[in-house]
Design a protein with these regions (language model features):
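Mid/C-terminal beta-alpha module of Rossmann-like enzyme folds, strongest
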Residues: 2, 203-267, 282, 287, ...
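N-terminal Rossmann NAD(P)H-binding glycine-rich loop of SDR-like oxidoreductase domains
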Residues: 2-22
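Short, polar loop motifs at secondary-structure junctions
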Residues: 29-36, 102
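NAD(P)H-binding glycine-rich loop region in Rossmannoid oxidoreductase-like domains
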Residues: 35-36, 41-95
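Short-chain dehydrogenase/reductase
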Residues: 78-82, 114, 125-137, 166-170, ...
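Conserved Rossmann-fold NAD(P)-dependent oxidoreductase catalytic core, especially the SDR/UDP-sugar
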Residues: 86-132, 151
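Conserved beta-loop-beta element that borders a ligand/cofactor-binding pocket
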Residues: 104, 137-162
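Substrate-positioning beta->alpha
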Residues: 164-171, 185-208, 215-219
């Protein structure tokens, strides 16, 4: 049994598809209100802030994937994330399950953002980044103590069909849909890597089912030909037959907008990632899995646009 904790988000449902297609039909989907992705999925409703329910959800699992996303709020992250990770580690230890943690880049030092690798220094300038570093430390300490086998599958900012949590899609795609100018945090001429969610899910499933991939950090496959904010806007506009207009969002505006749209206020401390080049190096993964085909940015944008016009409902 392979279990996904947080199965309803941008990555969880894609991961369920990838596991079913290529690795196993024994998949358990865990969230408050799990929905079947594949015909044979086992649905398990649980409150993932409750250690007892976490333990019951993990029981009988060979591999446990963490793809849950708690509310994007520092106070919630501080309260929920460390306790959740401790509970998962304890349950994986008790049930002899391997752990795969789907991670982001918030824990990296500011100066590492222009070229991030698995060896980049973890010295986060943001409070949310400090929470993320704490989670990584907890997992790596458990590995070092030989309590569990675990791996960290790390993604850049992501984009993909039908998701409502991508900064790229929220600020560029959705504005162009409304015939408005796209918006971009920071300078529009800085290059910025984005990981395509179906690629991230396929790669995470591969890692979880590769025994010698454990007890280390992996950057998930991300196209090396990065684009600037202006180029991302032009790419979306071309696919949508829209005019390519983009305006930068000044940092101070996030503070003001945060009074009305709280998530923008929460993102204020992360703007350093958009004020310089942002390059996510996944060459380690590609050397280990050279057969993996990374989706090109043009194809990724085509899929997003096609999906949006086929189905106007966007998953949150």
């Amino acid at each position: 049994m392979q279990t996904i904790l947080g199965s309803g988000g941008a990555i969880g449902s894609e991961l369920a598809k990838a596991l079913y297609q290529n690795h196993t039909k024994e998949i358990r989907l865990v969230s408050r209100n799990p929905k079947r992705v594949n015909p044979t999925d086992e649905l398990y409703s649980a409150d993932l802030s409750n250690p007892t329910e976490i333990d019951a959800a993990i029981a009988g699992s060979e591999v446990v994937y963490i793809t849950i996303g708690f509310e994007y709020k520092l106070k919630v992250w501080r309260e929920k994330w460390p306790a959740f990770i401790r509970s998962v580690i304890e349950s994986c230890t008790n049930h002899k399950a391997k752990l795969v943690f789907f991670d982001n880049v918030y824990m990296y030092a500011k100066e590492e953002i222009p070229h991030m690798t698995e060896e980049s220094k973890m010295s986060p300038p943001s409070e949310k980044g400090k929470v993320r570093k704490q989670l990584v430390d907890l997992i790596l300490e458990a590995v070092k103590a030989k309590k569990i086998s675990a791996l960290i599958a790390r993604s850049a900012d992501f984009y993909g069909p039908g998701i409502g949590t991508s900064m790229l899609q929220e600020t560029v795609f959705k504005n162009l849909q409304k015939d408005k100018a796209a918006q971009w945090l920071g300078g529009v001429n800085f290059k910025h890597s984005f990981t395509f969610t179906p690629d991230a899910a396929q790669a995470t499933a591969m890692l979880g089912n590769t025994p010698n991939a454990y007890n280390q950090v992996w950057h998930l496959p991300t196209h090396s030909d990065t684009l600037t904010g202006k180029e991302w806007t032009e790419l979306f506009a071309h696919q949508m037959n829209k005019k390519a207009k983009v305006s930068p969002i000044p940092k101070f505006m996030l503070k003001i907008l945060g009074w009305f749209i709280p998530i923008l206020g929460e993102f204020y401390e992360m703007t350093y990632q958009y004020e310089q080049p942002y390059f996510f190096d996944s060459s380690k993964f590609m050397k280990r899995f050279p057969e993996f085909k990374i989706t090109g940015y043009q194809e990724g944008v085509q899929q997003i646009v096609a999906q949006a016009y086929q189905n106007t409902d966007v998953k949150e």
